[in-house]
């Protein structure tokens, strides 16, 4: 059984994230979506809310588990005996940054590899930052996020 982890802040989870999760769920026995608490970011949704939104978004995927974490990713990888780290890369800038993290994670986990998945073309422009910006300017994000996220955003707007 191959277990992979897909870490991120997912603030909020987007259809681009869902693309990576769904494709990973086909490729691997188990996918753990690890929702990170990042003290250097001011999130739109707190950690518990983000975990819940991801859970609601992946409920149809039987081999996907969602966890929240505020530890070093390498520690989570070692504790859960993860086989590989999944990262989505949209641009060459993403690739350069993720390559640095992959080298560090490989060192800190005694060899666990990072696998880079580009998004399908349909979602190559979508990011949580863009979704938040559109939402904060009262734009329509309904085609960019799962239904549970849209409901949470609409509730937040009231």
Curated annotation (Swiss-Prot):
Keywords: ATP-binding, Coenzyme A biosynthesis, Cytoplasm, Magnesium, Nucleotide-binding, Nucleotidyltransferase, Transferase. One of its GO terms (cellular component) is cytoplasm. Pathway: Cofactor biosynthesis; coenzyme A biosynthesis; CoA from (R)-pantothenate: step 4/5. The record marks 17 as: Transition state stabilizer. One of its GO terms (molecular function) is pantetheine-phosphate adenylyltransferase activity. Gene3D superfamilies: HUPs. It is found in: Cytoplasm. It holds the Pfam family CTP_transf_like. Its EC number is 2.7.7.3. It catalyses: (R)-4'-phosphopantetheine + ATP + H(+) = 3'-dephospho-CoA + diphosphate. Substrate binds at residues 9, 41, 73, 87. Its main location: cytoplasm. It is an enzyme of class 2 (transferase). ATP binds at residues 9-10, 17, 88-90, 98, 123-129. It comes from the Bacteria. InterPro entries: Cyt_trans-like, PPAT, Rossmann-like_a/b/a_fold. Its cofactor is Mg(2+). One of its GO terms (biological process) is coenzyme A biosynthetic process. The keyword Translocase does not apply. Homohexamer. NCBIfam families: coaD_prev_kdtB, cyt_tran_rel. Reversibly transfers an adenylyl group from ATP to 4'-phosphopantetheine, yielding dephospho-CoA (dPCoA) and pyrophosphate. Belongs to the bacterial CoaD family. This is Phosphopantetheine adenylyltransferase. It comes from Histophilus somni (strain 129Pt). The gene is coaD.
């Amino acid at each position: 059984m191959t277990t992979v982890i897909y870490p991120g802040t997912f603030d909020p989870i987007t259809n681009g994230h869902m693309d990576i999760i769904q494709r990973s769920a086909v490729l691997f026995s188990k996918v753990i979506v690890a929702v990170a608490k990042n003290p250097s970011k001011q999130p739109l949704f707190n950690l518990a809310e983000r975990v819940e939104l991801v859970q609601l978004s992946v409920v149809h995927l039987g081999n996907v588990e969602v966890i929240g974490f505020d530890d070093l990713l390498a520690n989570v990888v070692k504790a859960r005996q993860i086989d590989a780290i999944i990262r989505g890369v949209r641009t060459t800038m993403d690739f350069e940054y993720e390559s640095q993290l992959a080298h560090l994670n490989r060192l800190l986990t005694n060899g666990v590899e990072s696998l880079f998945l580009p998004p399908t073309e349909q979602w190559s422009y979508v990011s949580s930052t863009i979704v938040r910006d559109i939402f904060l300017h009262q734009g329509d994000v309904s085609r960019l996020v799962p239904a549970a996220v849209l409901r949470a955003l609409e509730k937040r707007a009231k």
